[in-house]
Amino acid sequence: MPAILDVHGREVLDSRGNPTVEAEVYLEDGSVGRAIVPSGASTGSREALELRDNDPKRYKGKGVLQAVKNINEIIAQELIGLEALNQYTVDKTMLELDGTENKSRLGANAILAVSLATARAAAASLGVPLYVYLGGVQARELPTPLMNVINGGKHADNPLDFQEYMIVPLASTFKESLRWAVEVFHTLRSILKSKGLNTNVGDEGGFAPYLEKNEDPLAILVEAIQKAGFEPGKDVALALDLAASEFYEDGKYILKAEGKELTSDEMISLLEYLCDKYPIVSIEDGLSEKDWDGWKKLTDKLGKRVQLVGDDIFVTNPQILAEGIEKGIANAILVKVNQIGSLTETLDTIRIAHQAGYRTVISHRSGETEDTFIADLAVAVNSGQIKTGSLSRTDRIAKYNQLLRIEEDLGEAALYRGILNFKR
């Protein structure tokens, strides 16, 4: 098996123009793997630590030279000579080297970049696609995309409290679903223009129009689906990411758009009302990461009707997820590789979720890059769902294009389950 010959890190930029970490892993047989890590805007309080320099003279404190230095001067020395195909040993070595619960010594961004680059180098050495290396012969399911086309919350400068309003295309193949979504996206742009609303796009490629009520985007999306020639709920469904932790204060949910302060029970009633009125198949972070009792009530109330995705509450952490499963909280988990900070731990989380009957949604971050690792990962683990932004911005489209390539590569073996991924 090929051993690691060298590891190199560098500071590059993400889609928001902020520094991030890129790593390259070189093997003795000449194979090379490269990976760039993303960065989030709304983050869970228990995420692994993204190491920043905090030097106000460089990139307003957001530089990552220390993380890069940790790769080049600490991590590299420990990994040289290890077998690249033994991902567990590579990751375990870095985790032990860091020695902290949240990867604060070396930085989750440093560890993850090397972890993902190692997997790429191993796949290159074997001469197989990344999704095949990660998932083997069973890696054949293309994910249904949840596409963030209207932004609110921390992703936009508008009154909306909810962070993401998504369309979910339900065709018979990924390629056809992507086409349907693009047609709805461009129809949505025309509708927003006709209403005199802003059609500039945000971090994730979605629109951020000035809408006054949290329900308004749902009505506009239904209109866009219909005008594009599709049936809401049957051809194209809807999904929400409230990022509710961002507007949770002192035990109340502060909805500034409506001028209301809601209890957990009232928030649950609001979500139930929206599910009754609109073809919503998935709700992410419907309640705060601190509101575990509320999450249990939400799951009991809506868990048999819609997918309830835990993001901030689980932060892709296998131990926290196991606790949530035991308490009957949510029925799906959002998987972000940089929340936990290594490929091995990410795969552990996915395994625990699937064994418990929880669905997994592989996800990007708002600060993305041209790296397409998560597209391969979604197919490798047969996740069945992916969140990687809207239908604009190359950093988002890159993942969709990679999925098109994978679907073509799989040929007749490719599976696309569409609405079946959301059936309770």
Curated annotation (Swiss-Prot):
Pathway: Carbohydrate degradation; glycolysis; pyruvate from D-glyceraldehyde 3-phosphate: step 4/5. It catalyses: (2R)-2-phosphoglycerate = phosphoenolpyruvate + H2O. Its main location: cytoplasm. It is found in: Cytoplasm; Secreted; Cell surface. Mg(2+) binds at residues 241, 284, 311. The active site is at 204 (proton donor), 336 (proton acceptor). Binds a second Mg(2+) ion via substrate during catalysis. Keywords: Cytoplasm, Glycolysis, Lyase, Magnesium, Metal-binding, Secreted. One of its GO terms (molecular function) is phosphopyruvate hydratase activity. Its cofactor is Mg(2+). One of its GO terms (biological process) is glycolytic process. This is Enolase. The gene is eno.
